[in-house]
């Protein structure tokens, strides 16, 4: 049988555009720059002018909540609600939307609605959450552009809790949907779902050391394996996994116990039959399934015949009511290890009193014993967890408050500061994990003040290099993933940032002392309420230095500056939480703390992606930072210029010069010498980060733009714009 011809080319073909062997297939180690160009406006159907924050402010949130509460008990025949209430399902959906967050790199979380898309929509741990989203569709359809899927999923979780008698801590909207899968998130290297730690490409090494920044124990799980580590039903060992994974999501022991006990107060697990009855996940499902996955052939495939995790049963009686039942049952009974109908390890309570029996979710004539997972039992058998859980059991109000706060943190952790929260239910209380900064209550400096302060700063004797590196160090902690870090707050003067190696503490202290004196002198000279913050001065110093460097090159450039930053206090700074923002590598400063399994250029691209930079922005910043002499420790690597601290395009001109031949000088091939091709004279030294801009074809193409004789003006303007983007990255109040 011959192939039919392509209607476009007229040729026989088995492929269309985008098919065939890819560049990545040919060159699997090729630097992935695609992560810098995700979420293009070309993939977003809402259009460039769409302003979600503005749309959300016009939403009748109370009306949406009323509809969501009504939905909870409107059981649908195609997916019947357990006990006639979808609350447990909606809580799981919201939890799993938020629970992918990990504090190591700030990626994951509920902030983008990514559960709708691959791979999360098809993770084994998210089995049947596609049904939850389909149940929500009528509400989404009704309110349309005024509420994103990202916000709706979290709001549905809140409404589920409230409809079952729980008082939540609050809700902040403002999560904007993405429209294509995220390619920047490292979920692990395993090649099979739920691969155990003894399989190839394991995320574990040594004595069960979990690879950073991962916060889940197996590929396709949100946190832990509920059956125990690698399916081993050991509650104490499971407790170690629970503690590690929750800590990586920024939860302490008290928050962890509150979340587990509070969340498992509702709903049930589903394991009515074996997994061989379950069809493919949404991304692999046939066309006619219309995006629904895990279609089950076991009996009715729904209701009491549902197969999800493989564990079967509820944790306590009254699974649609907020009460202390979970903790009461956990400590009241002894537990026996059994296998669920699906073959999963779980525990059933022994000798259960009638009042603690659980009415079947779909047959009120049946009663079942409460069950616990191995992970649940860690709250009883891990000594630290047990102490907390028993305290909560004895103090219901404390437990309710702890769960409310932990749930709010879980569902809002990746949203950044409170200024990004929208809606009438935003809590008034300021929380330490929100990285608070004081409100600007003083009169801001004007353009005349800015000009005068630039002159004053440049007259202090601080070098261009010192001013640039300090401003960069302050601003470049920003992460677009969870909207943390940045220059606002001037936390570079506080622990832990002031002591980070990458920030060169000795030099930093000198610069900050000098800028603080400028601040004090300026503020003391004001008769009114006008003030300048140190946070603003740090950034302004960098801007002034860049402009001076342009003048040193015989050019002029205006670097934008917008005042309004304030200075946070040490009391407003959670030191342990900020430790994860420490750059272990910063290619923009040619810094790497130690050797890593991934290359220096990959670490650079990762840092650039967190800073929300494009490949051209990353390229022009590298070229500018090198000639500004902004390397860590004033190293000469990559400083391809005879006029350091002059903002020229020399980095690109000399990198692209064919008169230079490069050779590795280290066994790891991370340091290089560039010698004159004819004489052999040493001209330059470089790191992998420097040379990637001449080696990688895409980056070289960009570098060539800035290496042309007519590019100096474009280079200056593009550098100033990219610099301003980094300096302003955390100024959410200006949006």
From Swiss-Prot:
InterPro entries: Catalase_peroxidase (IPR000763), Haem_peroxidase (IPR002016), Haem_peroxidase_sf (IPR010255), Peroxidases_AS (IPR019794), Peroxidases_heam-ligand_BS (IPR019793)
Entry keyword set: Heme, Hydrogen peroxide, Iron, Metal-binding, Oxidoreductase, Peroxidase
Stated name of the protein: Catalase-peroxidase
Known EC number: 1.11.1.21
Transition state stabilizer, annotated site positions: 92
CDD domains found in the cross-reference section: catalase_peroxidase_1, catalase_peroxidase_2
Similarity remark: Belongs to the peroxidase family. Peroxidase/catalase subfamily.
Cofactor: heme b
Keyword Iron: yes
GO cellular component: cytosol
Cofactor info, note text: Binds 1 heme b (iron(II)-protoporphyrin IX) group per dimer.
Free-text description of this protein's post-translational modifications in UniProt: Formation of the three residue Trp-Tyr-Met cross-link is important for the catalase, but not the peroxidase activity of the enzyme.
């Amino acid at each position: 049988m011959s192939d039919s011809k392509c209607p476009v080319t007229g040729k026989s073909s088995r492929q269309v555009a985008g098919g065939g062997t890819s560049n990545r297939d040919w060159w699997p180690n090729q630097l992935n720059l695609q992560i810098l160009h995700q979420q293009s406006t070309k993939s977003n159907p809402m259009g460039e002018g769409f302003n979600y924050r503005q749309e959300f402010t016009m939403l009748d949130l109370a009306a949406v909540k009323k509809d969501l509460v009504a939905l909870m008990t409107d059981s649908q025949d195609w997916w019947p609600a357990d006990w006639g209430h979808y609350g447990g399902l909606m809580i799981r959906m919201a939890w799993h939307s938020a629970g992918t967050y990990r504090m190591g790199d700030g990626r994951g979380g509920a902030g983008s609605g990514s559960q709708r898309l691959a791979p999360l929509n098809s993770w084994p741990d998210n089995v049947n959450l596609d049904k939850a989203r389909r149940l929500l569709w009528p509400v989404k359809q009704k309110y349309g552009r005024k509420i994103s899927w990202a916000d709706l999923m979290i709001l549905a979780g809140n409404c589920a809790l409230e409809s079952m008698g729980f008082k939540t801590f609050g809700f902040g909207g403002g999560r904007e949907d993405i429209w294509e899968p995220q390619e920047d998130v490292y979920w692990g290297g395993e090649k099979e779902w739920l691969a155990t730690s003894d399989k190839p490409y394991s995320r574990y090494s040594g004595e069960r050391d979990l690879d950073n920044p991962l916060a889940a124990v197996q590929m396709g799980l949100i946190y832990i394996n509920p059956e125990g580590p690698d399916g081993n039903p050991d509650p104490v060992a499971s407790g170690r996994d629970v503690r590690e994974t929750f800590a990586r999501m920024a939860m302490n022991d008290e928050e962890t116990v509150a979340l587990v006990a509070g969340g498992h107060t509702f709903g049930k697990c589903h394991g009515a039959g074996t997994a061989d009855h379950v069809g493919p996940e949404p991304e692999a499902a046939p066309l006619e399934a219309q995006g629904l996955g895990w279609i089950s052939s076991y009996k009715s495939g729904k209701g009491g015949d549902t197969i999800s995790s493989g564990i079967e049963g509820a944790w306590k009686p009254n699974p649609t009511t907020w009460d202390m039942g979970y903790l009461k049952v956990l400590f009241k009974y002894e537990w026996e290890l059994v296998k669920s109908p699906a073959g999963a390890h779980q525990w059933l309570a022994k000798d259960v009193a009638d009042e603690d029996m659980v009415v079947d979710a779909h047959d009120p004539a049946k009663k079942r014993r409460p069950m616990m997972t191995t992970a649940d039992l860690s709250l009883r058998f891990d000594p630290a967890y047990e102490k907390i859980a028993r305290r909560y059991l004895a103090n219901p109000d404390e437990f309710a408050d702890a769960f409310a706060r932990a749930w709010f943190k879980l569902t809002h952790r990746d949203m950044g500061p409170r200024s990004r929260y929208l809606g009438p239910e935003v809590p008034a209380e300021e929380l330490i994990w929100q990285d608070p900064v004081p409100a600007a209550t003083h009169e801001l400096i004007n353009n005349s003040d800015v000009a005068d302060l630039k002159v004053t700063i440049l007259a202090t004797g601080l070098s261009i290099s010192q001013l640039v590196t300090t401003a960069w160090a302050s601003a470049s902690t920003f992460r677009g993933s969870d909207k943390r870090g940045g220059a606002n707050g001037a936390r570079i003067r506080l622990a832990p940032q002031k002591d980070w190696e990458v920030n060169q503490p000795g030099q930093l202290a000198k610069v900050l002392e000098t800028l603080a004196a400028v601040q004090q002198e300026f503020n003391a000279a004001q008769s009114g309420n006008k003030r300048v913050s140190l946070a603003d001065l740090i950034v302004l110093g960098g801007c002034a230095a860049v402009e001076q460097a342009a003048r040193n090159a015989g050019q002029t450039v205006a670097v934008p500056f917008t005042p309004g930053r304030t200075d946070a206090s040490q009391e407003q700074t959670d030191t342990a939480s900020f430790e994860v923002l420490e750059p272990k590598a910063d290619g923009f400063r040619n810094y790497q703390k130690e050797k890593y399994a991934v290359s220096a250029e990959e670490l650079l691209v990762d840092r650039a992606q967190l800073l929300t930079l494009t490949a051209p922005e990353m390229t022009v910043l590298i070229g500018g930072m090198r000639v500004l002499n902004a390397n860590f420790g004033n190293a000469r690597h990559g400083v391809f210029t005879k006029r350091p601290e002059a903002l020229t395009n020399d980095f690109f001109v000399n990198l692209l010069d064919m008169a230079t031949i490069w050779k590795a000088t280290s066994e790891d091939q991370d340091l290089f010498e560039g010698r004159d091709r004819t004489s052999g004279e040493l001209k330059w030294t470089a790191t992998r980060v420097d040379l990637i801009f001449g080696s990688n074809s895409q980056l070289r193409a960009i570098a060539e733009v800035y290496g042309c004789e007519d590019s100096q003006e474009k280079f200056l303007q593009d550098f100033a714009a990219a610099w301003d983007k980094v300096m302003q990255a955390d100024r959410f109040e200006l949006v």
